[in-house]
Amino acid sequence: MADLLRLEHVSKTFSPGTVHEKKAVEDLSLALAKGDFVTVIGSNGAGKSTLFGAIAGSFFPDGGKILLDGEDITFLPEHRRSRQIGRLFQDPLKGTAPHMTIQENLALAYLRAAGRRSPLGIVGQKERVFFRERLAALGLGLEDRMENPVGLLSGGQRQALTLLMATLVTPKLLLLDEHTAA
């Protein structure tokens, strides 16, 4: 079976050449097949979030190569990777736009993952019904609050919404960075 994700000698150093230099990831190689479920364990500051950031494209590694489904994505911008990679952040505030409504956040996630561009206000009835059904499945009553700003949600509600946003269109890879932190 071909690798879904392959990292080859990936390294990332922050503030290189300064007194604050920090090697967050050093010469890491791994291969994951489709369907693999992997847990990365390490103490605070061990580089787990840095690893996820490099895979998701939040920043580029200093060295090495990242391949997703055989495609070299090492220097592919984050917005292009987000069509294939779903992500939940350690901080639930990072996964949503708090001043936008639940529906607007879902629309952004849906359009991004589907690779479509559309003015934000243009969400058809079909999409609204789809969003409502998916929200109802969470059992949190958010389907009745689709016009409410996300900033009014609790941390747990926002994290559940972020998970839904990351999986509205099934990603090839789902990264969960301390997703229960909320």
Give the positions of each predicted feature:
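Conserved ABC transporter NBD signature motif
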Residues: 64-72
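A short, proline-enriched helix->beta-strand linker immediately N-terminal to the Walker B motif
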Residues: 167-172
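Q-loop/switch helix immediately C-terminal to the Walker
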Residues: 99-115
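A short, flexible loop at the N-terminus of ABC-type nucleotide-binding domains that lies
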Residues: 2-4, 13-27, 58, 75-77
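Walker B catalytic motif
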Residues: 178-179
